Amino acid sequence: MSDEAEFPPAPQVAGTSLDGTRIFTVSAEENARLCRSVGVAPAADGTAHPVWYYVATQVAMGKTVAGVCETCEFDVEDGPMMGSSGVRFSGPIMVGQPYKVGGEILSLVRKKSRKLGVMDVLTYRLRLHPADGGDAILETDNVWVLPRKELA
Amino acid sequence: MSYAVGDVIAPFTINAVSEDAMKDWAVFLADPNPIHLDVEVVKAKGLGDRVINQGPINVAYMMNMLMAAFPDGTIEAMDSRFLDNVYGGDKAVASGKITAVDGNRVECEFSLDIEGRGTVNAGTATIRLNA
């Protein structure tokens, strides 16, 4: 019998929309503050620090982190862990430019690891678009590990 | 500037990971998870005895290294894996090297290492060199 047969399957959440309705804009003040917090000066050409890819998509997606966890039938208080984050840019994030977020959950896969026991591996994809329409300027795939203590 | 496979990327160093920065990021991320803000919560959860840096801050350190190394380029793609926690007060060093050069694109691999503990993040990036 395989390990996977020892515990119930993960909730079927692939395809869940993470489209947001909120408009997200990086202000010059926020960008300067973020840059200082990570040890660099803000760019002089109007581009925001590229790590805003993560912040903007998380804040303006259609669910909170706790809400995404709830969709996966996971209590955020149980401690989701970041597994990986990938981003592909087709253009820079600009200070003062309004953006909106589209996206979806790609998969939720239940696994067993020696270190963490039973866990669900959540992968979701988010895109950052100009708020007035047009192609996404970036696409990001984030992977979270959701330890299933109750199944350990 | 010219780039070659095997070139080492100049490191980017944070001498002491800032707990105040974590407070800023709790606002940026609209996520007041107390493991980034309250050491007593970290202790209670058995996660250590210092507050834990938000993961994307570690990504920013590695981006800083890449942006400094390629002032004539932009990050086109980047993937990073989170291998361990970074704590307040840690000395963090992002470093890397060039693994491929193809026309106006440079491929890199990199890591973020903590003094005394080793690698906590690792990944790859593609830099597009501007004409």
Language model feature labels by segment:
Chain B
Residues M1-T13, N85-A131:
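HotDog/MaoC-like acyl-thioester-processing domains
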